[in-house]
Amino acid sequence: MALFESPSTSPAERVRAASGRVASASGTWVLIGENVDHFGGVTLVGTSSLRAAAAVSPRTDGVISIAARGPLGQEFSAQLPYSDEPADGLARRWWGLVHTLVQRQVLSRDTSGMDITVESDVPVGAGLGALYAADAAIALALAGGHDDVDTAPFRARLAEICSHAVDTYSSLPVLRARHSVALRGAEGVSVVDYADGSLTQAPHPSRHGVRVFSVSQELGAPFTQSREAIAERRAFIDAACSNFGVSSLRQLPDAPGRAVQWVEARRAAGDTNAPEPEAARRWVAFCESETLRSLAAAKALRSRRANELFTLLNSPSEAHDLASPDALVALARKRGAV
């Protein structure tokens, strides 16, 4: 099995070759609780020693110029008219981030162009949030002129802006906790509660004698197999929240049962866009179960109960109908992973 080796110089050092304000952000990895953000659930996320760095400087010619380089030799560059939205891809993602920062008054409304240079040690496709780290580094560099850029409230606001921009301008699903932890995470594990937007800390699993590795079937491209299913699920949960008048389904008693009743009523009324009742039940039950597992894992970390933590991590989750690398997980466990 090939091992990834990071470059010998840091991305912040490499990006200083470009002019402008420089900032960096860490890669992230999810311990438990992925895909429960729209439900209002809880996700546990750690930070990686691998980082992405960005250098930004303003332009006055109506152009957003992007140059990005990853650790596997990938390079991306684009010259974008400031006022014309690109079709898709990284260009649209980061063009949209600049415009969202302007709309939220983090950047001046007089902004008319930008040079953006990104250097990253985080390999795309490794499950370490490479694009999220780059988003966060760009946003930090662009917002670096604010006196309160290092305060928790400003970082929380910046994370929300990043997630909103990616949700609006990228075809990839966004996991908001990754932006939050890339911008606000510490050495331990961050516990992100979507019900109230809080981010608290729990001890790192390494104190129980384990090391955390990323194992991937292939590197170089983001994992996209389940993006349509994730988008469908999130749209359903958003619609259910609107129907029941709650900000998250986590606030709704007996959420799986009531979601099924609502879907059945829609289908009986001739709504052809309503999902299958059993699929709706599985979606909500998964989010509910995964949130409970996340809360229990955070409690186990904080109370130093290693056996309970690893039992939780290895216990099967509710059916989620999303693509997952089950064979790779089985191989890793066969080779000694816990």
Predicted regions and their residues:
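Gly/Ser-rich oxyanion-binding loop with an adjacent helix/lid
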Residues: 1-29, 33-45, 80, 87, ...
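C-terminal nucleotide
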Residues: 2-32, 53-92, 190-338
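Catalytic-core region of right-hand nucleic acid polymerases
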Residues: 44-47, 53-54
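A short, compositionally biased micro-patch
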Residues: 47-49, 59, 121
